[in-house]
Each structure stands twice: as C-alpha cells, then as structure tokens.
Amino acid sequence: MADRGGVGEAAAVGASPASVPGLNPTLGWRERLRAGLAGTGASLWFVAGLGLLYALRIPLRLCENLAAVTVFLNSLTPKFYVALTGTSSLISGLIFIFEWWYFHKHGTSFIEQVSVSHLQPLMGGTESSISEPGSPSRNRENETSRQNLSECKVWRNPLNLFRGAEYRRYTWVTGKEPLTYYDMNLSAQDHQTFFTCDTDFLRPSDTVMQKAWRERNPPARIKAAYQALELNNDCATAYVLLAEEEATTIVDAERLFKQALKAGETIYRQSQQCQHQSPQHEAQLRRDTNVLVYIKRRLAMCARKLGRIREAVKIMRDLMKEFPPLTMLNIHENLLESLLELQAYPDVQAVLAKYDDISLPKSAAICYTAALLKTRTVSEKFSPETASRRGLSTAEINAVEAIHRAVEFNPHVPKYLLEMKSLILPPEHILKRGDSEAIAYAFFHLQHWKRIEGALNLLQCTWEGTFRMIPYPLEKGHLFYPYPSCTETADRELLPTFHHVSVYPKKELPLFIHFTAGFCSSTAMIAILTHQFPEIMGIFAKAVLGLWCPQPWASSGFEENTQDLKSEDLGLSSG
C-alpha cells in the first residue's frame, strides 16, 4: 500500500495541470491566448498605423511635405554629412563609455539588460517566459535556484576577530568600517540562534538579553547587558556581549569571558539535571550548551592571541572531545591554525586525516593546509630550472597536485599569499570558495606559508597551472563541483566597499561593447580624415567604390559629390 501510494503521488506530480484535482482547468488556454495576443499586438498596431496614414494623407498634405523634405535633403552639402557623422560618433562614444562603466560596476551590459527586460516582452518574447507549473523548464528553474542557494550559503568565520578589541581599534586608527551591515546582521541572527530560547521569559535577565541581541546600536546593546547583570550577576550571555563589544583589549576580553565561563558552567549543570522534565527544558539545555561552547572557544582564541598556544590547543581538543556533535562550528580549523603556529606538523596531519574526508564539507583551511604539508617536504630543494630539466619527482608531483586541488577549491587565495593583493580584516562571515574565505584564510595562515622555506616559491610557480585543467570552471570542475557563479554578489555584501573584490573567472567584455568601440572609433577617424584631407579621402573612397561597385554610374556620381566638396572647401578657404 505504501508503494502504491508513492506511485500515485508521483503520477499526480508528473501529470498535467488540467488533470490534477483542485487546479483551474482554464489556466492553460488563458495563458496561451494572452501570449498569442502579446505576440501579434505589434503587427496589428503597425497595420493600423499604415491605414491611418493612408486615410489622412490629403488633410495632412503628406505629399507636399514629403516633397519639401526631399528638396531639403538634396540641398544639404557634404560638409553637413561630415558634421553629422562626427556628431553621431561623439554620441556613440559617450554611449560606449557609459556602457563600459556600467559593465565594470554591475557585471552586465546595460543595453542587453534593457533589451531583455523591457523590449523583449514588447516584441513578443513573453511566450517563452511562460511555463506550466509541472513543465520540465519550471522544474529546471527550481532545481537551479535550489543549487544557487546551497552554493551561496554563508558560514560563520571560525577565526572571526573581536569587535571591541580588534575591529573597533581598526576603525579608530583608519576611520574605515571593516564590517558591513549585512555581515553584522548575520551575526545578530547567529547570536539570537545560539543564545536565546523559548524559556527566556522565565528569567528576567534572559529577557533583557533577548532584546539586546536584536538591538542594532552597539551602545544600546552594552547598556542592556549591564541591565541584565543588575538583574542577575550570573548572566553568562551578558558577559559574552561585554567581552565581544566593550572590551578594548584581548586581556579585558579574556577576563570577561572567564566570568562568563564561571556563570555558564553553573547554568549548564542546572540545565543538565532538568533536561528530561519537558521539551522546554531540553531547548534550554541546548541553548546553555551553545553558550558554554562559545565561551570556551573564545577563551581558546584569547589564549592563542596572547601567546599561550598550548593552552589554546588543549581547550580546543577538550571541546572537540566533549561536544563531538558540534562539528558544524568548525573548531578543527582553529585547532589547525594553532598547531601550525606550534609547528606540530604530525598533529596537523592527524587532524587533516580526520576532517579532510570526501563526506565532509571542504574549506580553504583544509585544502590549503593539506597543500602546505605536502609542499613542506619538497619546497626547500625545489627549483623551476632543475624541475624543467630533469622532471618532477613523485613527492613534487604530489605537492603540485595538492596545490592544484586547493586552487580549484578557492582560486582567490594565492593572490593574497603571494601578496599580489593587499589584505584587510576578515569579515565575521565567509562564503566558501569566495573572496571572503580567501581573506579569512590568508589573514591567519600567511605567516605559516612564509615560515616554510620555498613554499611560496613553489606556489608561485604552479598555481596558475590549475586553470588549464578547468577551462570552463562555471560549467565543469576537475576535483570539485563547478565554481559557483554567485560568489561575487555575496562577497560584495560581506566585504567593505573600500576593498576591491576578487572575481573569478574574469568576465570578458561582451561582443556588443567591442563592436561599438570599433565602430565608433573608425567612424570618428574617417570623419576627421575627410574633414582634414578631402582630396586624399576622396581618392581612397573612389578606389573602394571601384572595388565594390564597378558600375560607372556609382563612380561618376561620387566624382560629382567630390567636386562639390572641393569647390565648397575652396570657397570657405578664400572667404
């Protein structure tokens, strides 16, 4: 019965809209009629306009007006056509400059966008845009949209900085805002997810903090945190907010996080004892677990920044053992960076063996750290001249393949590691395979690549070879899925405006822009040469017409126009 029911549902989904109960059976022919009328509307208007002109030809004196226009056109001199050509070239050049600026800023042609969005429906292009609810085209559109959403998923930066002690100090020094509103809004949503639950109304301090996480103004959030501490001196989330946003040094932030840890552990033990009483208590335990893990992780990051790296590694290992389900927080990336700072490369390899798995999501930290370890074994003795003369060894081939794998996953990282682009403070959220992830990785890992002698040299010699293996990265990848086309838009939302977002693959100018540029330039050049050297250009044009139009009437007519141009030019010169 279950299988039979499943087949019935599949048949109902694949059936046409008219055969599915509950759908309007007249929807299909109405849409088709509307599309047909839209397609023939332009032709009907054209025929009606011709008929109206024929009926009004005598009252409007169309014949006399047409004769006057003909006389006016015949009286125009060649100088007028030269000036007209120059003016049209100037206008076309201005249009080209605007088109180039629009394409450079928005990544699309303005004329093409207007044509597709506004002119195509008027020219009868609405039929192709109408698809039935169960048609394959509609299914493909839905599948593509779901794929784009999954590709453009934004992740919280595992190594994000402290707002008060790092981001705000940067603003004080440079006057620039390193975080965008979109990035901070995502952080506010994360805080509400991690630090709030349905039982917050039971404790007044949690109610105040629930409002504080939704507050946009930083001073108002800090004020709300102090109000929560007045109501409950053991409010862990209030200490977390103060450590993140009010503390101006890492030492102050660590002190507040230690107070938060003391309060968070007490609340966590109480929640563990009551977790089986009701679903609300289970939700409260999940919230208190998130708070405790967040506090310990930030304490580990404080210890890492203050030079107590072994202490930071111990805290991270304990977290990963105590809360293994929370791998989504990517604590292993914090651990990898700390182990690299200790130069504990065997431990780094052990972590990679666990997390660089085909079933787990990849990241720039995973791929580039794996490439760094393989590069480390050969980079010291690597020489491009020697390699080209004797060929690559097995270890060198493995290192080059690891670099190609990492570059395919995120092609923006090498420019930052090789210092071809300047680094900025990483955002609080990153887009995997995007420029934001590249900045976040290079900001913390550049020193580890510099520490290994020859690693950057090997990277510089081999990273561009990746692009020969994936000539069409948006359509087909080599080791990963095709590169998502939505990274540029998402990165522009995550990164500040003063940063030049890296784009991959490089967008080429449309053929229309190249054609417009060539046409405008050549027309303007011909107009200038004709104005300055009428005799030479006349001989050149006569030769061209002789090649393409060998009829005698064409050359004789052109000679008359050339003689008129010469006589008028002489008359102007003598005057």
Curated annotation (Swiss-Prot):
Q: Where is the composition biased (Polar residues)?
A: 126-137
Q: Where in the cell is it found?
A: Membrane
Q: What taxonomic lineage is listed for the species of origin?
A: Eukaryota, Metazoa, Chordata, Craniata, Vertebrata
What is the recorded membrane topology of this protein? Multi-pass membrane protein
Q: Which Gene3D superfamilies match?
A: Tetratricopeptide repeat domain
- Give the main localization category: membrane
**Gene that this sequence comes from:** ST7L
Determine if Translocase is one of this entry's keywords: no
* Highest taxon in the source lineage: Eukaryota
List the CDD domains hit by this protein, alphabetically.
Answer: ST7
**Which species is listed as the source?**
Homo sapiens (Human)
Regions crossing the membrane: 36-56, 80-100
One GO biological process this protein is involved in is: negative regulation of cell growth
Disordered, as annotated region: 125-147
Name by which UniProt lists this protein: Suppressor of tumorigenicity 7 protein-like
Family membership noted in the UniProt record? Belongs to the ST7 family.
Pfam families, A to Z = ST7
